[in-house]
A protein has these predicted regions:
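FAD-binding FR-type
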Residues: 93, 116-122
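Iron-sulfur cluster-binding cysteine motifs and their immediate structural context
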Residues: 41-48, 69-88, 99-116
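Pocket-edge positions in alpha/beta enzyme catalytic cores
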Residues: 86, 115, 147, 207, ...
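Conserved AdoMet/S-adenosylmethionine-binding subsite of the radical SAM
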Residues: 121-272, 276-279
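Auxiliary Fe-S-binding modules of radical SAM enzymes
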Residues: 1-25, 228, 237-315
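N-terminal pre-triad scaffold of radical SAM enzymes
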Residues: 13-67, 88-96
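Short glycine-enriched, charge-decorated loop/helix-capping segments at active-site entrances
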Residues: 57-59, 205-211, 280-289
């Protein structure tokens, strides 16, 4: 594939975040790609799950359908309507809409778009703006999502182009992707952040929508294909799912044979994405569940002990 072709390759991106220090070494720019096979009950980025753009409705900003109806007039499908004095959307009518004229017509930003079709070159121009910070800190570009490898062609083109521009690369993956894409990406990745949520496949299916066998197989294949590549296995600790010493021990035993290049990190459950569910007219399935901070700290200490120096403490 030529660089000219790579630069023109397109994909759906829902955010580009600068100055991140939690998603790989150094200071990084994260490109968030849309689409994910999993439906984690605690997901903090619900806008990442569907592969196509979506409309977010923030009725706190809507000035009222008695004063304004630009969005309703702009929608070619009649999906936008007045629910009393505010805007509402018939989601089933706009599920595959990529025009989203309603959001572009809203003068108050009460409607916003999650997801934009961009070329590799457009993304890399943003990423490249902070190249001096990458050079000083050992940072670079991280692909995230969603599951970035769901848009395999686009993700691979981004990684190749970053390499061509001497920008270090990393990826955050849930592992639920085509193994061939993951292994091809390994050629262009300096660092991998790989989620292992649970070794219990039945619990995994209950909490994410899918079993874990394919994810486990993908991590094994990646470690075998690239035995020296730095990989950080991460587990979001979710109350009632994997917040036990037994769950951590099972993951520790799984990664132990892979060698010192595979490290481990626990991440605390949080509720920061709940408002986005409201914007998408979805229910947050974890309800009002919260993490017991004292129990989490004890679990951190336990992980540090059983992983014998391979356990990262989150920054």
């Amino acid at each position: 594939v030529s660089r000219i072709e790579d630069k023109k390759t397109t994909g759906y991106v829902f955010n580009i975040q600068k100055y991140s220090v939690h998603d790989g070494p150094g200071i990084r720019t994260i490109a968030f790609l849309k689409g994910c096979h999993l439906r984690c009950r605690w997901c903090s980025n619900p806008e990442s799950q569907e592969p196509l753009p979506q409309v977010a409705v923030n009725n706190n900003r809507c000035i009222g359908t008695d004063k304004c109806h630009f969005c309703m007039d702009a929608c070619p499908r009649g999906a936008v309507y007045s629910d009393g004095s505010k805007v509402a959307i018939r989601r089933e009518l706009c599920k595959d809409c990529t025009d989203l004229a309603c959001a572009n017509a809203c003068p108050a930003q009460g409607l916003n778009i999650y997801g934009k079709l961009q070329t590799v070159d457009e993304v890399m121009k943003v990423v490249e703006q902070d190249a001096p910070f990458y050079a000083r800190s050992g940072g670079g570009m991280t692909l995230s999502g969603g599951e970035p490898f769901l848009q395999g062609k686009f993700a691979l083109a981004l990684l190749r182009e970053a390499r061509a521009r001497f920008i270090r690369t990393a990826v955050e993956t849930c592992g639920m992707c085509e193994q061939s894409v993951l292994l091809e990406a390994g050629k262009y990745l300096n660092y991998v952040l790989f989620d292992i949520k649970s070794m219990d496949s039945a619990k995994h299916k209950e909490m994410t929508g899918l079993p874990n066998e394919h994810i486990i197989s993908n991590l094994k294949a990646l470690c075998e294909e690239y035995p020296d590549k730095p990989i950080l296995v991460r587990t979001p600790i979710v109350p009632g799912f994997n917040d036990t010493p037994e769950a951590v021990t099972a993951i520790a035993e799984f990664i132990e044979p892979f060698g010192e290049h595979v490290q481990y990190e626990m991440l605390p459950y949080h509720r920061l994405g709940t408002q986005k569910y409201e914007f998408l007219d979805r229910s947050y399935l974890m309800g009002d569940v919260s993490l017991d901070n004292l129990a989490y700290k004890k679990l951190l200490k336990y992980a540090h002990r059983v992983l014998k120096g391979r356990h990262h403490i989150p920054k």
